[in-house]
Each structure stands twice: as C-alpha cells, then as structure tokens.
Amino acid sequence: MGKLIAVWGSPDSGKTTFSVKLAEALYNRSRGKSAVIVVFTDIVTPTIPVIFPNFRSEDVFSVGTILTKPDFFADDVVSNMVMTKDRMNLGYLGYKDSENKHSFPDYTEEKAKYLYDVLVGIADYVIVDCMSLPDSNFLTSVALEKAEQVIR
C-alpha cells in the first residue's frame, strides 16, 4: 500500500513545483524502482499542459475522463496517466488544456476516495498537488482528509 502525500498552501506558493520536484526526488532516490504518481487537482488552470508543453493533445489524458466513468479500475487509471518514455514508474494525472469545471459531469466524494484508494494500491507514493481552497473540488478535500502527510 502506497503513501498519500498532499501538498497544500496559498495561491502562487510553489505547490506544483514542489510536487513535481518531490516526485522526481522520490523516483530518483529509488533509482526508478518506486512507482510515483502526481495528481494535479486544479480544474481552474489545468497543469498537465504546463508540465508537458510539447506533448500532442492525443498523448495527454485527463483525470476527468476517469472520474466520469460509472466504474473504473487500476488499468483505467494507468491508461489515463501521462508518462515519459524514460521514466515509466513516474506518472501524472490532471486535467488537460481547455478543460474546466463544466467539461465533465459532477463526480461524488466517494468516487474521489475510490480514485485515491486505487492510486495508493498501484503506487508507492501518490503526491497530490492540491488547490488552495479545499472546497474547490473533491480531489483536493479528499486528499487533505486521507493523506498520511500534508506538506504546507
């Protein structure tokens, strides 16, 4: 069972940068043997296009796609992760460019909890880059609730 780490703080405080750097450090410390997943919860300003600016839109997937499915499993989550070829144990989940809170139907708190249960079941570390306002979405509020460690 993996460890859920939530990164939370004020707007523009470097949460996303810290989340990516922490994921890289954990991945490198294990020499690529630890599976690390970063979840970007920001639906207002999607992070995936910022982290992967040169990826084609068909090579980038959305966490919103997973959350709108009636049922999903570990394979569905893995197939919707963004990974680079040289770091197959380092995955990223988040929203794509041009997506916003109106792009997908609403999902439940239980579905967010289930997503994190699936993620900690398949990864050694799950790092959640939370939105500054915990009530902004269930991905943020559930991560702060379920995290073994909250970095602020």
List each model region and its residues.
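Conserved catalytic-core segment of NTP-binding enzymes
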Residues: 114, 120-121, 125, 130-152
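Short acidic, S/G/P-rich loop/turn micro-motifs used as interaction or catalytic elements
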Residues: 13, 98-103, 133-135
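P-loop/Walker-type NTP enzyme "switch/lid" segment
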Residues: 38-121
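Residues at the starts of beta-strands that form the adenosine-phosphate
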Residues: 34-35, 89, 149
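Conserved strand-to-helix beginnings and helix N-cap segments that scaffold or border functional pockets
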Residues: 20, 105, 109, 137-140
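Walker A/P-loop NTP-binding active-site region of P-loop NTPases
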Residues: 3-73, 125, 130
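Alpha-helix termination/capping residues and helix-transition junctions
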Residues: 30-33, 87, 120, 144
